[in-house]
Amino acid sequence: MADAWEEIRRLAADFQRAQFAESTQRLSERNCIEIVNKLISQKQLEVVHTLDGKEYITPAQISKEMRDELHVRGGRVNIVDLQQVINVDLTHIENRVGDIIKSEKHVQMVLGQLVDENYLDRLSEEVNDKLQESGQVTVSELCKTYDLPGDFLTQALTQRLGRIINGHLDLDNRGVIFTEAFVARHKARIRGLFSAITRPTAVNSLVSKYGFQEQLLYSVLEELVSTGRLRGTVVGGRQDKAVFVPDIYSRTQSTWVDSFFRQNGYLEFDALSRLGIPDAVNYIKKRYKNTPLLFLKATCVGQGLVDQVEASVEEAISSGTWVDVSPLLPSSLSVEDAAMLLQQVMRPFGKHASATVFSDTVVVSEKFINDCTKLFSERMHQKAEKEMKNNPVHLITEEDLKQISILESVNTNKKDKKDERRKKATEGSGSVRGGGGGNAREYKIKKVKKKGRKDEDSDDESQSSHAGKKKPDITFMFQDEIEGCLRKHIPDAPEEFISELAEHLIKPLNKMYLEVVRSVFMSSTSASGTGRKRTIKDLQEEVSNLYNNIRLFEKGMKYFADDTQTALTKHLLKTVCTDITNLMFNFLASDLMMAVEDPATITSDMRKKILSKLTEETKVALTKLHNSLNEKSIEDFLSCLDSATEACDIMVKKGDKKRERQILFQHRQALADQLKVTEDPALILHLTSVLLFQFSTHSMLHAPGRCVPQIIAFLHNKIPEDQHTLLVKYQGLVVKQLVSQNKKSGQGEDPSSDDLDKEQHDVTNTTRKELQELSLSIKDLVLKPRKSSVTEE
């Protein structure tokens, strides 16, 4: 019952409070959100939404929670982890990081992580523990262990050296931290090891062999060397090729170098390299800086050796001999170094040194070279005289002709020589109206002009300038021939020297040979001056005779048909016309010192060579004459011949009736004399046919053997029937004999043709007997006395 009343009193009290309480207004959640957003937009409230959108958080609270989280995590936290813990956007975290770093100096931002000094102190303690345990730690290993950048870690550890970390940083390699005990231990090892070294040793090999820390080794080694604790030097710096050279070795080395140089007078760079001296050139320069030395490619030579070579060279030059300096030099000296040494020795002589270097080591005086040249003097004269006789057209070059022409113009007045030539020509052929009959014509024109006749006063200068532009195109001797002669003269000379000397002598010998050729031609020209006078007279007479013969031969050809005339024309151009052309060219060649003994030996190429050396005025006429030999017209050839004789100042006597009768008679007699002595059936038939043609037509004929059938056919109605029948029969036998001979030569040694050979032999014997029986009768057709006509006489 009492409990019920207690409950009633409690309810009455609650009701009374409710009656007297004031009423309050409550906002909905939506209204709250709108109000907060309004305040944020008006910048009256600065709060940040959480990622789930259920809460607002102030920037100050974010900073507080970041500091708390950094402390909880031991002084190092990643900002990504902070974003997950605080549950706000990463941008707000990054914005507050800058404020924290500014307000708290002991906090730093490293690789997206907040790190404070407490963490770095604990890290330094851990590093110190490792350092004391191993004696050294490397920053690179610490970077991998703690995932921090090397520069940041080096800076942080450096600040704590001596305070937290009991060690010191290598000054040369700031990536290593040592303890004093470690450095002292290594220093003692390095000192002991290098104190025991007695020869140059590569430092790099010791690092790998004894496990030294490379940078520490170089630092300690340099310190020990600089303080004098170690006697030696480090060559090559802090590189893979660094070498430690102890003083005891250097002293031994220097003693050996001094002794070798004193005894031999030179030093080899390779030998010094084998001694452990890497830069031999600089070593020698420092060692012998007050000693005159000559540095070559692979060696260094002292003044004593240079003086010895120089004395030998001077002796060779003064005595007019040669010397090979290689025996005077050490055998280890290369050919290239010997050549460089000799070049230095020859330099004081300057450009006027009367010596030449062969094979790099052989010095030859100019006097010796001249003596070698004189060995070939006699042979030059012999060869020049022989070549002049054999083929002078190809022996003398155009340049030689210019120079010879200059020499002639110096000794002879141009006008007097021209007048003298005209006088000689007149004496040899008679006056205009005398000697050739009333109808004779004579042609006279200017003498052939030669290049080089102008400017006589400057002949030497022009000669030298031309000689420099055009080399001789003749060869005296080949190199192997010259080498053979030199071996006999200097048997003790090296083979390479002989070869180079021969090559050196080729041009001078060819030049001398050219001078000898000129001299031979000039002497030959001077000795045959009187003979030339007769030559001009004889030439004009011979040209006139051949000219008239060609005219008469042309007249005889007109009795035949066109095809036969063509064959006769070609034959005449190839023989008589070519002979008269060669006479003309040989006449001009005599003025050019290019004449040959027999004009018949002049070929087409030789005529072209002569043409190339003529003046333009003469060349035009002679070129047309040369080209007309390949044409098919005698009239064109004679027209060109008239122009050529006119250009060459050759007077040609044109024949009259009396002259023609004399030529006909002489030609007939010449053919008859030849017919009397010959026994060749083919030639008998040929000569008889031509003579019968002349008897019947009173015209000369110059025909080849293949035109004999046409001549016999022409004579059918010109001679008695019995004579023509005999001639035709003889012709058949001649043809039969020729066919038989051709068959015999064509069969050769064929065994299957024995029977045919026997039969052919019988036929040939029969034919030969018949020809022998008829030959006398055929000759009698023209040789037997007969009545002569008036025109034949």
Curated annotation (Swiss-Prot):
The enzyme's main class, written as a single word, is transferase
InterPro entries found in the cross-reference section: Ufl1, Ufl1-like_C, Ufl1_dom, Ufl1_N
Q: Where is the PTM Phosphoserine found along the chain?
A: 458, 462, 752-753
Q: Which residues carry this modification: Phosphothreonine?
A: 535
Task: Identify the EC number(s).
Answer: 2.3.2.-
Question: Posttranslational modification, per the record?
Answer: Ubiquitinated, leading to its degradation by the proteasome. Interaction with CDK5RAP3 protects both proteins against ubiquitination and degradation via the proteasome.
State the residue spans of region: Required for E3 UFM1-protein ligase activity: 2-212
Protein name in UniProt: E3 UFM1-protein ligase 1
The protein's organism comes out as Rattus norvegicus
- GN (gene name): Ufl1
